[in-house]
Amino acid sequence: MLNGYTILDLSNRVGWLAGRLLADLGADVIRVEAPGVSIAGADWQAYHVNKRLLRLDIQTVDGKRNFDQLIPDVDILIDSAQPGDAFAQHLDWARLKQLNPRLIKVSVTPFGCEGPRAGWLASDIELMAAGGAMSLAGEPDGAPMRVTVPQSYGWAGAQAAVGALTAAVHRTATGIGQHVDV
């Protein structure tokens, strides 16, 4: 389904499933990791199956230059850069669409890229509580309860993949990329 699509995955745990789903649909997903970052964990292996690995230190001048050289050939970029973080400025949508007007950028962060909570960090349990999901677990009249498997990361990743696919349909019709903020 997505044969011929090239995707750069710079996301953290919140967005890992998005890249996995798009890879499962046939896209060429390139996982970008800094040199020295361990890829030995079972969770890393599970979410990055069907992806190629590119070791690139995007915090350095050379790494940023090499990253910029990739963008014109990329269809979708998935990131989890928090607004205000050092590399987030390099991932600025206005700057990236200058490099590739057809690019689809999918940002997967706990509270989005804009608004009063943009830039806030949150764990899965905090996101489940904030979203009301904990009130759905446990006894009918009991206290909210955490579901043991991280739910919010999966929901965010699935929604990011759907957002990327929707933006790809839009791009096919218009020729224009867009920023999807999950």
Q: Where are the regions a protein language model picked out?
A:
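Structured beta->alpha junctions
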Residues: 11-14, 59, 109, 153
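Glycine-rich phosphate-binding loop and adjoining beta1-alpha1-beta2 segment
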Residues: 24-57
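Hydrophobic/aromatic beta-strand patches that form the interior of the parallel beta-sheet core
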Residues: 30-32, 54, 78, 104-106, ...
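Active-site-adjacent "lid/gating" segments in soluble enzymes
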Residues: 21-25, 73, 85-182
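Nucleotide-sugar donor-binding loop of glycosyltransferases
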Residues: 11, 33, 81, 109, ...
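Conserved small-residue-rich beta-alpha loop and adjacent elements
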Residues: 1-37
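Hydrophobic alpha-helical segments in the ANL/AMP-binding
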Residues: 17-21, 41-45, 161
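A structured beta-alpha segment of the ubiquitous adenosine-cofactor-binding alpha/beta core
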Residues: 8, 47-98
